[in-house]
Amino acid sequence: MPLTVPKAILFDLDGTLLDTAPDMAASLNRLRVEEGLEPMPPAQIRPHVSNGARGLLAIGLDITPDHEAYQALRDRFLALYAENLAVHTRLFPGLDRLVEELDARLLPWGVVTNKPGGLTRRLLEALALRPAVVVCGDDLNRAKPHPDPLLYAAGKLRLAPDSIWYIGDHERDIVAG
């Protein structure tokens, strides 16, 4: 099958388009300190950032969603993260040039993430990023790995799904794509 030029490019956010690990690790460590625990090395947290709050709470506090304190701790983590959303978060190296080139070529690009919409949109605004479409984990009834978010993004762009490239860093991205 010959490689075709895409009509749009969609990116996962955390760990793909943006290096959010420093701010997410700092927020998890603040929560750990509040809970009387020692901070974890950021390098130990980084591999789990793509798993969102659930994954970070699992490695940082050893709790899962069935734990009675999970929701309260998740809410506290997200509040801490919201306070420090874009302190150290940046585009991964080279992606600033890629985004500029996509804009220059008038090739639409967007974000499809499982991150909550409020955090996603504030983060994109803080970094002065203006994707053509943004689909977040709480925008639809089903998030990735279900394909609905990608199909919804294609619909918003008015493009056939098979004319769009999707770039992600996790198995859920592959399954969704």
List where the protein language model places each region:
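Residue-level marker of regulatory loop/turn positions in helix-turn-helix DNA-binding domains and
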Residues: 2, 112, 142
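N-terminal helical cap/lid subdomain that shapes the substrate entry/recognition surface
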Residues: 2-97, 104-105, 116-121, 130
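Generic enzyme active-site microenvironment
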Residues: 10-12, 112, 167
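Substrate-recognition "cap/lid" segment bordering the active-site pocket of phosphatases
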Residues: 87-90, 116-176
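Surface-exposed amphipathic alpha-helices with a cationic face
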Residues: 96-104, 154, 174-175
